[in-house]
């Protein structure tokens, strides 16, 4: 209790309730639904149970489907929302047939003979200063789910599904290979106790370490209030870990009996290798040896605990002797999904996976989906012909490939998760459909990418690759500050930063990353005041169609996933747009792209610089597809199985006569104290879209969709860095013409006043009261425009941005964003709103 449902590790079926408690809850739930008056549809009810007395309390009731409903649907195979929709139009439960059994009715309550574990995924590293304590405010950004025969197996599968570079309950204090000589047991135990006192995302790993160091169940329960049953399960896993360590160190190998015991408990090959010092490949070879009596097997989710046969192949892995996979003899393709949602990799990629599955069905091929995210459409049992609810690791994917023997595997739709498997799968002889792993590496590897651009005669900002701090200092000095720094091979701009001087670079190199030959740091000249552009293309290996070119509304330096963007570009010259189209075509053909490709460019003084190229589906594919009315992911999938764009009838992209604006949605209200200032590290968790024939209206709609309604009147507060003052003057003049009053801090106010604008000077927070934050709190400000330059100004203006967020004000931290906001306000005040469906817009192109 006290931790939001979405942030809790969840287990089904309930493991620690008595049958009497379960029946009381079931009866209470039915009485509540009838009392509230829910005649049809789904409802969610949360209870609290006192484990000592059995006292039952109702926490809340939602007369609708909820996040828990989605999880329950995936856990049981019982599609709650689908059935609720049928009930709403007049069906009764006994009239709806269960899709999975094809025999039973929806009135037959689902029963499961396996264990499901859901673990949330967090992104605290993205939000400097955020409190990592888990409370009643949900803070997770995604989740992974696993299915196994036991809680232990399911828990370990769920942990590796999170993609945290952890293979299991890895020690946080260096105890994976036992307690080392000279280890400070007392100091480590105190650190662990400190971590256990409050609920945090990593708590379960610290519980494992506490068990390794001998902490009793009584003390663990006193610190965590985790039920003793779960503590005993974790203790059993730690005992097996210890036996693995001892046997491997004693005889240099593992007996088959212990290996199979570990595999049945959900230990991955990598985790066993980590514990024993043996190679993961040798462990795989041992368990795959000819004549072995046991192997990885697959069971079906059937909603009825095997009482009836399941006709829908919804599968999970375990270790045993009887396999229910029953692969068909049809030609088939495996699609790897994106895993748990996270910042930088969300449902945009799931959209691509689902459309790929649709395309394969249209082409008569059997579709196999592999994913572990219960929030997605790709893990619906009827999206693909066969669904494997499994972690997206090399081991788990190879096991499925070995069982199914597909024509090939699709990696380019699930984001970075499946792309990381390109090389190991290729080495294992697995056919990769679409763009080759070598082409992906040419685009990802900075030195090979530079050679590619030189070969094509394309421009790139000056850059260098540092493998040490000294190299970084030397490269940055040669390029000249400001520079953009980031680790190689990342998605979502993780640990990416703009640094303005050597001191900032040294701080970054010391805290954000550890540079090495295996993990170099990329340093690029930061193109200040440049316009960033995103472009998506589709290629069949011979023809390239540039489907969409998007102009970012925020300037270069704000992560592409966080910037609003417009399709088509709203301010770029047509000559620049054509040059970007030419460069996209050259890049796709040189890389040998088959399928989708995304590239990002910076435009400065009409010169186009290539920032990066991603020969895969990008997060902008759904936006572009809806903006132009073409299912790009579907077409791309068809090119990957040999169809040409000419054959598919897609040889040029439509030119829409309307404008589409994508705006990012941020979780800042979940993290009090976190700065809302945008930069090269991605922070958004979703996006919305506005469409209109007029850019101003399209932008205004996108802001409303993101929950930031543009004001129609009132006072606008302007405080900008010195280089932004000319742009701020133009914005202020436009706002003044629209009837807004202007407030500004002393420096900005003086500049505006010197250029003939009437402006009221307000105090900074450090200059006395009433200051600007007081005015925002008192409701005297309607719009905030705040840009910063130095680190000191970042800190000085943090409270302004935070209070604007708290009050729900429209706020802009770039001048291009502010200019777009003014265009939106002007459209609302002076231009007529037209309402059309998406289909109508796409028919008018």
What are the functions of these language-model segments?
Residues 1-247, 251-258, 265-266, 290-295, ...:
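ATP-dependent carboxylate activation and anion-phosphoryl transfer catalytic cores
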Residues 157-158, 285-294, 299-458, 467-474, ...:
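ATP-binding N-terminal substructure of ATP-dependent carboxylate-amine bond-forming enzymes
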Residues 223-232, 274-285:
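Short, basic interhelical loop/turn and adjoining N-cap
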Residues 260-265, 271-275:
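Extended, domain-scale alpha-helical bundle/helix-rich regions
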Residues 444-447, 490-494:
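Conserved A3 ("GATE") glycine/threonine-rich loop of ANL adenylate-forming enzymes
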């Amino acid at each position: 209790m006290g931790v939001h449902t979405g942030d809790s590790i969840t287990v089904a079926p309930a493991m620690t309730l008595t049958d009497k408690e379960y029946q009381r809850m079931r009866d209470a739930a039915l009485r509540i639904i009838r009392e509230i008056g829910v005649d049809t549809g789904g409802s969610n009810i949360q209870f609290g149970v006192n484990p000592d007395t059995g006292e039952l309390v109702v926490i809340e009731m939602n007369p609708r489907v909820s996040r828990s409903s989605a999880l329950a649907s995936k856990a049981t195979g019982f599609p709650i929302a689908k059935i609720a929709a049928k009930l709403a139009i007049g069906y009764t439960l006994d009239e709806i047939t269960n899709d999975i059994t094809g025999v039973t009715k929806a009135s037959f309550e689902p029963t499961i003979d396996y264990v499901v574990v859901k673990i949330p995924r967090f992104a605290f590293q993205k939000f400097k200063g955020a409190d990592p304590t888990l409370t009643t405010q949900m803070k997770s950004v995604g989740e992974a789910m696993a299915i196994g025969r036991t809680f232990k197996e399911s828990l370990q599968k769920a942990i590796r599904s999170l993609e945290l570079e952890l293979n299991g309950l890895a020690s946080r204090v260096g105890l994976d290979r036992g307690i080392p000589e000279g280890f400070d047991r007392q100091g480590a135990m105190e650190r662990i106790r400190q971590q256990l006192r409050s609920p945090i995302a990593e708590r379960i790993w610290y519980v494992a370490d506490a068990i390794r160091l001998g902490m009793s169940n009584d003390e663990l329960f006193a610190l965590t209030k985790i039920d003793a049953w779960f503590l005993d399960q974790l203790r059993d896993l730690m005992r097996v870990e210890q036996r693995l360590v001892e046997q491997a160190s004693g005889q240099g190998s593992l007996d088959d009996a212990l290996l199979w015991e570990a595999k049945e408990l959900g230990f991955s090959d990598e985790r066993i290798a980590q514990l024993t010092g043996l190679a993961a490949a040798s462990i795989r070879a041992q368990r795959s040896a000819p004549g072995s009596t046991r192997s990885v097997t697959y069971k079906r989710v059937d909603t009825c605990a095997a009482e009836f046969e399941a006709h829908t192949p919804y599968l999970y892995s375990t270790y045993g002797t009887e396999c229910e996979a029953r692969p068909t003899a049809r030609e088939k393709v495996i699609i790897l999904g994106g895993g748990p949602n996270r910042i930088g990799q969300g449902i945009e990629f799931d959209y691509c996976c689902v459309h790929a599955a649709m395309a394969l069905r249209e082409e008569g091929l059997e579709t196999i989906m592999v994913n572990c995210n219960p929030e997605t459409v790709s893990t619906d049992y009827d999206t693909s012909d066969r669904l494997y609810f499994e972690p997206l690791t090399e081991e788990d994917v190879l096991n499925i490939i070995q069982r199914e023997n597909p024509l090939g595997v699709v990696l380019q739709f699930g984001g970075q998760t499946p792309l990381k498997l390109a090389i190991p799968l290729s080495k294992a002889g697995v056919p990769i459909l679409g763009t080759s792993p070598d082409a992906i590496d040419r685009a990802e590897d900075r030195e090979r990418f530079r050679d590619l651009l030189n070969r094509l005669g394309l421009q790139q900002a000056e850059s260098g690759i540092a493998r040490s701090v000294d190299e970084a200092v030397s490269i940055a000095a040669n390029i000249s500050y400001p520079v953009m720094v980031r680790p190689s091979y990342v998605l979502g701009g993780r640990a990416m930063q703009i640094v303005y001087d050597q001191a900032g670079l040294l701080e970054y190199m010391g805290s954000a990353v550890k540079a090495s030959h295996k993990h170099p740091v990329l340093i690029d000249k930061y193109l200040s005041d440049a316009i960033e552009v995103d472009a998506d293309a589709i290629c069949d290996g011979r023809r390239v169609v540039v489907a969409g070119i998007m102009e970012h509304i925020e300037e270069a330096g704000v992560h592409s996933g966080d910037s609003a963007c417009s399709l088509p570009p709203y301010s770029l010259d047509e000559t620049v747009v054509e040059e970007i189209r030419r460069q996209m075509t050259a890049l796709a053909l040189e890389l040998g792209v088959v399928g989708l490709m995304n590239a990002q460019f910076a435009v400065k003084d009409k010169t186009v610089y290539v920032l990066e190229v991603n020969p895969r589906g990008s997060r902008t594919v759904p936006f572009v597809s809806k903006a132009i009315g073409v299912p790009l992911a579907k077409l791309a999938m068809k090119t990957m199985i040999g169809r040409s764009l000419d054959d598919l009838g897609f040889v040029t992209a439509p030119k829409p006569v309307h404008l589409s604006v994508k705006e990012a949605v941020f979780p800042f209200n979940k993290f009090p104290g976190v700065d809302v200032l945008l930069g090269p590290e991605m922070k958004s968790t979703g996006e919305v879209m506005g469409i209109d024939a007029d850019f101003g209206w399209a932008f205004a709609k996108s802001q409303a969709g993101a929950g930031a309604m543009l004001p129609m009147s009132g006072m606008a507060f302007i405080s900008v860095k010195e280089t932004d003052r000319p742009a701020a003057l133009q914005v202020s003049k436009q706002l003044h013409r629209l009837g807004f009053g202007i407030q500004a801090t002393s420096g900005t106010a003086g500049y505006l006043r010197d250029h003939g604008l009437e402006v009221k000077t307000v105090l900074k927070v450090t200059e006395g009261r009433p200051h600007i934050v007081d005015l925002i709190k008192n409701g005297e400000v309607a719009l905030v425009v705040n840009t910063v330059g130095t680190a000191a100004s970042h800190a000085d203006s943090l409270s302004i941005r935070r209070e604007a967020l708290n009050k729900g004000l429209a706020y802009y931290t770039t001048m291009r964003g502010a200019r777009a906001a003014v265009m939106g306000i002007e459209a609302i005040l002076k231009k007529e709103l037209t309402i059309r469906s998406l289909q109508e817009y796409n028919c008018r192109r």
